Amino acid sequence: MNEFDARLLEGKKRLHFVGIGGSGMFPIVQILHAAGYTITGSDVNEGDIINYERAMGIDVKIPHAAENVEGADLLVYTAAILPGNPEIGRAQELGIPCVERSVMLGYVQRLYAKSICVSGTHGKTTTTGMITQVLEMAGKDPAAVIGGKLPLIHGYGKAGKGENIVVESCEFSNTFLHLSPDTSILLNIDADHLDFFKTMENLKASFRKFAELTQRRIIANGDDANTVETLAGIGREVVTFGQTEGCDYIAKNIRMVRPAFYGYEVWHRGERLAEVTLSVPGKHNVYNSMAAFVASTLAGCTAAEAVRGIDAFTGTGRRFEVLGHTACGATVADDYAHHPTELEATLSAAKQMGFERVIAVVQPFTYSRTKLLLKEFARVLQIADQVVMSEIMGSRETNDAFNIYTADLAALIPGSVWFPGFDGIVDYIEKNAKKGDLVITLGCGDIYKAAKRMIV
């Protein structure tokens, strides 16, 4: 990983963003725009984020074109930008420096006196959103970079005037190694992105490097064996949370307060600090909210302020987000879950909510993940009453090296059906879903588009 360049924006006035309509770009754009830089950008399609950016006075061009970069001092691009992009090519011809989004995120994070960087295979977006909500409701005006839309701030992040920034920190391609957290959070470490990391040891080594970048304090899940092993002998202050004795902060007396929603007490060194009642479903959110409670109180919030923000948190976009109803009255929801651990947590919560049936509409994401975890996918998807699937979304991969298809997964799930496109899925739901059912689309690709077509 390259060393941080503190002079990255020295003498720079106009910053051009390629892929400016992406949710990961938007908070960075907001922060740098508020800092006084002239921002321009481009993307391939119009969208809500671009509408917001234009309302801020930002010049956004559709589509990408070489002339868009003329006069820029620096170009920022997302990892989704394909080789041969005309704007990057023209920038290189003109000698305009080009940096990937994660590099700029590392720079932006350092603009704030204190940073809370949230890492982990699962739960990053929810936990980042919770912490942001607590700090915002406590009047601390944090900056934030979140992977999902947080209703309280009407977006994926914000440029705060306070001393804190809360950053969702992704391990894929080692992008979180550009950060320098004041406080880092390790929620869990699970087998994912092995197309990049190849082995669990490499994955854990990456998280270890991230933890070693921490300047002040590491907040870690003391119940997660991989996390505990990764942090052994780290030489930093480590504060643990969990549900077992031995953790610094312990969730006790966990109970279901209504179907799929949990409450619990927070204890610290024998003292009962608070009682939390979650407004997001699923027992897995006990861990996410414990991390948020610890981070928020150590950032200067009172226990009461932490509880107020956590209790009021109803989720972020694409995290068990209820979208509406079908013509027959079935409830339609959407969730980003795309790993067996996440699917198991989401479907288990859904089954507790009192619906007649849970119909899981799944878009497997990447050939490598599907092949590696095929049996685990088959096991957890059978939690649902009915499984409907699309073809695998390859994203950055081609199937030549993997030879895996949705039909292979469907063969392991009795009664499941699959369709090559969304038309077949939507038609199937229209004909088979009934009032009292929950239809939940699952995946980190574009399966949400099918969900939106189902609702009236």
Language-model-detected regions and their locations in the chain:
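A glycine-rich beta-strand to alpha-helix segment
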Residues: 424-455
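N-terminal leader/targeting and accessory segments in enzymes
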Residues: 1-100, 104, 225, 252, ...
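Phosphate-binding loop of NTP-binding sites
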Residues: 6-8, 31-34, 54, 68, ...
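C-terminal helical cap/extension that packs against the catalytic core
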Residues: 260, 378-435
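Nucleotide phosphate-binding/pyrophosphate-handling subdomain across enzymes
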Residues: 3, 8-16, 24, 31, ...
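Short internal beta-strands
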Residues: 37-44, 217-222, 359-363, 384-394
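Beta-strand->loop->alpha-helix junctions that form or flank phosphate-binding loops
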Residues: 42-43, 61-64, 99-106, 145-146, ...
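Short acidic/histidine-rich motifs immediately flanking catalytic phosphotransfer sites
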Residues: 69-74, 163, 435-437
